[in-house]
Design a protein with these regions (language model features):
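Membrane-embedded helix-loop-helix hairpins and adjacent transmembrane boundary segments
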Residues: 2-574
């Protein structure tokens, strides 16, 4: 079966407008994947009778299954397309979002925060806020989270459609509807249980498919040193291959960011906000069978997270070394008919994959997009059903009614996500869109949750007004810069800051606003009595000890191991 290429120019090979045509073996591989996904949904429908079954997979997942699902829920288009694009745009600096922007927060979730989430038996993060602060905080966070999840789901739809357009020449609208219908069917049937099993399957496929690009690309460039040499030749004016060395100035690195923005904005705020309060990922850990499994799951996920740059960031760096002409922002690409940063991964896929391998590679991408869509849609269904519908509209319905509502809400979430897919096209790259959303909703939420867990004096009024002030301040700062670009120097501390740097600093300021308002209001309003804080706050929760367990079975032991590996990697790529 022939592979059709229409030339533009791709370094030693051409960049085509229509990149590849599927051979029969490729179609068979993709069709088998779709059949397996739908089959899992139909099979697991029999095990989703109650609300706990549908929304939390019956709380029966082992640490390994919950841990891999915890990571796979985040290994969708945001990782595959978005961070490959970010690596092309910013170089190895994009790796910060996997290491300092993930590992410490995941370990903190497992060791410090998971006991409160799990012991309180909440269905969601907004559910925890209801128990800790009351109904107003729950509704505010639920509405914000529901809004964010459908916007995030749109990223996956847009990215999958982009791959089908670039790699296969398929119509973008057709691709969106095929993926949407498939996700709606299997999540409606099996709920979170179906989503988790498919996420583990998709995790394996993603690694099998995406790793091919990294291995073959390094062979072509002559290994890591050969790739670095080619990048320096293609981009002599910038340093794209060091993690920390160029972070002492806003102007010495491609991102236009100072190390304080990475350490404080990303490492201390956005990463902790996302990995400890975003219900999309926390929901997977809540499905663990016991507290030890729930604590181990994020730690297992952190171990794998450290390796993800080798299948996500590396293709973007290989694109810097190999692709010509240079890629550009989405708006410029649309205007000129060129290729954007967002297309670096499908371009690399087109460069290396023939029949069979192409089917595996495309299936890996489809798996990643559908994993991200399913994660957001299932989380949206849970938050809507428990934190909005049950809390405000129909409080005393049967369990079966809430399961039915969850299924209908899944369909609604998919339909709304289709509309949001087209919003992504207005941003320079996928990751600029994602990080803007995180700075709006995730950074302030982390301030509220962590104060609520660790400070008994934190009052219901303080939690609500702090969360609201943090969210509105972030949106306000974003609007200020859009209306007056000169304001960037006040938000990001430099007029040279790029979009990603602005997102980091905006997240930091919104978190500070949230914490200050929460503390100030709490000090002048009445806190809850300690009798109402049992299992919700440090000092009021009886957390089972682990002294009777062998060292290798203790979550803390593995957290230390992962933490040491994290430090070593940062030193190696300094």
């Amino acid at each position: 079966m022939s592979i059709h290429l229409i030339a533009l120019s791709l370094g030693d090979a051409p960049i085509p407008t229509r990149l590849l045509a599927l051979a029969p073996v490729d179609m068979i591989i993709i069709a088998l994947y779709f059949a397996m996904v739908l089959g899992i949904g139909f099979y697991l429908k029999r095990y989703t009778k109650t609300g706990d079954d549908f929304f939390l997979a019956g709380r029966e997942m082992t640490a390994w299954v919950a841990g891999l699902s915890f990571l796979a829920a985040n290994l969708g288009a945001l990782e595959l397309m978005g961070w490959a694009a970010a690596a092309y745009q910013y170089g190895i600096l994009a790796t910060h979002w996997y290491w300092i922007g993930a590992i410490p927060a995941m370990l903190f979730l497992g060791i410090v925060m998971m006991p409160f989430y799990y012991i309180s038996k909440t269905h969601s993060v907004p559910g925890y806020l209801k128990l800790r602060f009351g109904e107003p905080s729950r509704v505010l966070s639920a509405v914000s989270f529901g809004f964010m999840t459908v916007l995030m789901s749109g990223i996956n739809m847009y990215s999958m459609a982009l791959v089908m357009k670039v790699v296969l020449g398929w119509d973008i609208n057709f691709s969106i509807w095929v993926s949407s219908i498939t996700v709606a069917v299997y999540v409606c049937l099996g709920g979170l249980l179906s989503a988790i099993f498919n996420e583990v399957l998709q995790f394996v496929l993603i690694w099998m498919g995406a790793l091919l690009i990294s291995i073959i690309g390094l062979i072509e460039t002559g290994g890591w040193s050969g790739m670095v040499a080619r990048i320096h030749t293609n981009f002599p004016g910038g340093d794209y291959t060091h993690l920390w060395r160029t972070m002492g100035s806003f102007t010495d690195n491609p991102m236009g960011i100072h190390w304080t923005g990475i350490v404080l904005g990303l490492g201390a705020v956005i990463s902790f906000g996302y990995w400890t309060t975003d219900f999309l990922v926390v929901q997977r850990v809540l499905a663990a069978k016991d507290l030890r499994a729930a604590k181990l799951a994020p730690i297992i996920g952190a171990g794998f997270k450290m390796m993800v740059p080798f299948i996500v960031i590396l293709p973007g760096l290989l694109g810097l070394a190999l692709l010509q002409p240079k890629l550009m922002g989405e708006a410029q690409a649309v205007a000129t008919g060129g290729h954007s940063y967002n297309e670096v991964l499908p371009l690399m896929l087109a460069r290396y994959c023939g029949p069979g391998l192409l089917g595996l590679g495309v299936t890996a991408l489809i798996a990643g997009f559908m994993s991200g869509m399913a994660g957001n849609v299932s989380a949206f269904a849970t938050v809507w059903t428990y934190d909005i519908y049950k809390a405000l509209i129909r409080k005393d319905a049967t369990d079966a009614h809430y399961v039915s509502m969850g299924r209908w809400c899944t369909i609604l979430g998919v339909l709304v996500s289709i509309g949001t897919a087209y919003l992504v096209m207005q941003f320079l790259s996928i990751m600029d869109y994602v990080q803007a959303l995180f700075s709006f909703f995730i950074a302030p939420l982390f301030g509220t949750v962590v104060l609520g867990m660790l400070w008994k004096r934190c009052s219901p009024a303080g939690g609500f007004w702090g969360l609201l002030a943090g969210t509105l301040s972030s949106i306000g700062m974003w609007a200020w810069v859009k209306l007056d670009p000169a304001a960037l120097k006040y938000i990001a501390l430099s007029s040279n800051a790029r979009d990603m740097a602005e997102n980091m600093y905006r997240a930091l300021w919104s978190w500070i606003v949230c914490v200050l308002v929460t503390v100030a209001v709490s000090l002048v309003t009445k806190p809850k009595p300690e009798s109402e804080l049992i299992n919700l706050v440090y000092g009021c929760t009886d957390i089972p000890g682990e002294g009777h367990l062998p060292m290798h079975q203790r979550p803390m032991f593995w957290a230390v191991v992962v933490g040491l590996c994290f430090v070593v990697l940062n030193v190696i790529f300094w």
